[in-house]
Amino acid sequence: MLKKKKTEVYALGQHISMSADKARRVIDQIRGRSYEETLIILELMPYRACYPIFKLVYSAAANASYNMSSNDANLLISKAEVNEGTTIKKFKPRARGRSYPIKRPTCHITIVMKDISLDDEYVKINSLKKPRWKNKHTAMVYHDMYSSGGVWDKK
């Protein structure tokens, strides 16, 4: 029996103290990108969620270099997901003996990286791809060229 070589590694961050929606806003920007491009994006985005995600991406790359001895230039984020974690519930004391509940949401973030140099399917697909724009012979047309001149076309 032939054993397939491992092409994916992951890093998992649990109970990160932020809302899952705020983390998803950042994760949606990096999904499917290369490792180096992801680090640049995460350093330049102005969100608080970028730092824990940056640490997870860096950890997943370290896992890839240690477990698969892969190069950082060949890494691609194949899957990135955010799940809701437990909600931390506390009470804040207020005046006259009252208390207000505080709910701190947490989330679990999973980053899966793939080494494209080890993945045979990725190499085959990229070698078979042909640019689609070479087959089409369409000229660029100014969008207001065919306006009918009606009342609705004027600003």
Curated annotation (Swiss-Prot):
Q: Which GO terms describe its cellular component?
A: chloroplast; large ribosomal subunit
The answer to keyword rRNA-binding applying to this record is: yes
Q: Which UniProt keywords apply?
A: Chloroplast, Plastid, Ribonucleoprotein, Ribosomal protein, RNA-binding, rRNA-binding
- Domain of life of the native organism: Eukaryota
A Gene Ontology molecular function term of the record? structural constituent of ribosome
Q: Which PROSITE patterns match?
A: RIBOSOMAL_L22 (PS00464)
Q: Where in the cell is it found?
A: Plastid, Chloroplast
Main location per UniProt?
Answer: plastid
Any one GO biological process = translation
| Keyword Chaperone attached | no
Question: Hey, what's the signal peptide range on this chain?
Answer: none
Similarity annotation: Belongs to the universal ribosomal protein uL22 family.
NCBIfam families, per this entry?
rplV_bact
Q: Main role?
A: This protein binds specifically to 23S rRNA. The globular domain of the protein is located near the polypeptide exit tunnel on the outside of the subunit, while an extended beta-hairpin is found that lines the wall of the exit tunnel in the center of the 70S ribosome.
The UniProt subunit note reads as follows: Part of the 50S ribosomal subunit.
* UniProt protein name: Large ribosomal subunit protein uL22c
Q: What is the name of the gene encoding this protein?
A: rpl22
